[in-house]
């Protein structure tokens, strides 16, 4: 049998097979990346860390629920800021460093490592954790460890990759681009897959309160709540799988 060559990696640190799908960006104030495909920023102009803490941590009752073996899944890895914010929250919960969280994230349009670094340099609070993240990404790794967190990045169309995933999450970060601009990420079929890959009593949180998204999640089995949004945004959504 002929030897299968090792995959080659681009200068951006991504396998060349997904190079053509690398996110195309513009920038606001040289600090906030905007996906040109969807004309949508990757995080709030009023504070990325604070937004993640309010929406994805607060909406999932984290870090209070975090414990060894806890599993988080995410739709939309982007800059990796949600992962870094989680890591910052986990450290005080596990001061001896004995526990391990599991973090699986699904991303169709990976950001080039140089662009990730450009976005994350504006969050010095997370610098100690972003450095090993960027190193792993530069090496083309899709499975690696940060302090206290085992990370798995799944590239490809989530409508294909999520059904093939064998895991279940205790908490979901639903962070795709706006439902109005990226409706494929928020349809009934995909929200049913999210529920299928959620442990009983597991939760989700998302920045959007769009009615059709809430109905899709409720139809999939979640008890959905509408909560105050971040930084003047009227509402966000969170829920529990019953």
Model-derived regions, located:
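Rossmann-like AdoMet
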Residues: 1-73, 87-124
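Conserved glycine-centered beta->alpha loop in an early N-terminal alpha/beta scaffold
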Residues: 76
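Glycine-rich SAM-binding Motif I of class I
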Residues: 80-84
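S-adenosyl-L-methionine
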Residues: 115-165
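Short SAM/SAH-binding signature in class I
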Residues: 151-153, 167-176
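Conserved beta-strand signature within the Rossmann-like core of class I S-adenosyl-L-methionine
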Residues: 200-208
């Amino acid at each position: 049998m002929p030897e299968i060559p090792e995959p080659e990696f681009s200068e951006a640190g991504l396998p060349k097979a997904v190079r053509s799908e690398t996110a195309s960006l513009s920038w606001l104030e040289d600090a906030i990346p905007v996906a040109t495909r969807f004309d949508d920023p990757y995080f709030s102009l009023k504070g990325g860390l604070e937004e993640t803490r309010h929406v994805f941590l607060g909406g999932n009752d984290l870090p209070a629920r975090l414990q060894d073996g806890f599993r988080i899944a995410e739709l939309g890895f982007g800059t990796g800021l949600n992962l870094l914010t989680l890591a910052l929250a986990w450290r005080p919960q596990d001061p001896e460093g004995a526990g391990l969280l599991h973090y699986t994230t699904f991303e169709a349009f990976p950001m080039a490592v140089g662009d990730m670094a450009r976005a994350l340099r504006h969050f010095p609070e997370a610098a100690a954790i972003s450095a090993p993240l960027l190193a792993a990404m530069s090496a083309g790794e899709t499975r690696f460890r940060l302090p206290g967190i085992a990370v798995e990045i799944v590239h490809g169309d989530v409508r294909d990759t999520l059904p093939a995933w064998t895991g279940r999450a205790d908490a979901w970060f639903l962070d795709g681009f706006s439902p109005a601009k990226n409706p494929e990420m928020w349809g009934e079929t995909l929200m049913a897959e999210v529920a299928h890959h959620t442990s009983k009593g597991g939760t989700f949180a998302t920045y959007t309160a769009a009615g059709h998204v809430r109905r899709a999640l409720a139809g999939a089995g979640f008890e959905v709540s509408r909560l105050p949004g971040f930084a003047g945004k009227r509402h966000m959504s969170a829920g529990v799988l019953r």
